[in-house]
């Protein structure tokens, strides 16, 4: 039998490249799972850390209501909000194409249940004026 003088690393590199390809493909599918919302631009935005305890309420451009990235009717959302603690943190993510009326409906639901700790998601407006 012939003795190996050194270890052949080419098969190891092949396996690593296949694993890298799998990770990259999987990561792209995970990022596509989020609801696409074109949030409005604002010049006075503040960077905030994502709060894991905050509830996420989203309105898409086709006026669909989402609670933590799951489609929900306005009636079910109203029931859900009524069950929250008054100090509950809420993040609103509203598409810029949505009629202002829908935004008011959502904030009215929160106000009716005395939810005051609300953050609105916007993009930083970088256009020079």
UniProtKB/Swiss-Prot annotation:
Q: Which GO terms describe its molecular function?
A: transmembrane transporter activity
Which GO biological process entries does UniProt record here? protein transport
UniProt membrane topology term:
Single-pass type II membrane protein
Q: Does the keyword Mitochondrion apply?
A: no
Which InterPro entries does its entry note?
ExbD, TonB_ExbD_2
Q: Any idea which UniProt keywords this protein has?
A: Cell inner membrane, Cell membrane, Membrane, Protein transport, Transmembrane, Transmembrane helix, Transport
Tell me which GO cellular component terms the UniProt record holds: plasma membrane
Its biological purpose: Involved in the TonB-dependent energy-dependent transport of various receptor-bound substrates.
Q: Which family does it belong to?
A: Belongs to the ExbD/TolR family.
Q: Describe its partners and assembly state.
A: The accessory proteins ExbB and ExbD seem to form a complex with TonB.
Q: What name is this protein filed under?
A: Biopolymer transport protein ExbD
Q: Which gene encodes it?
A: exbD
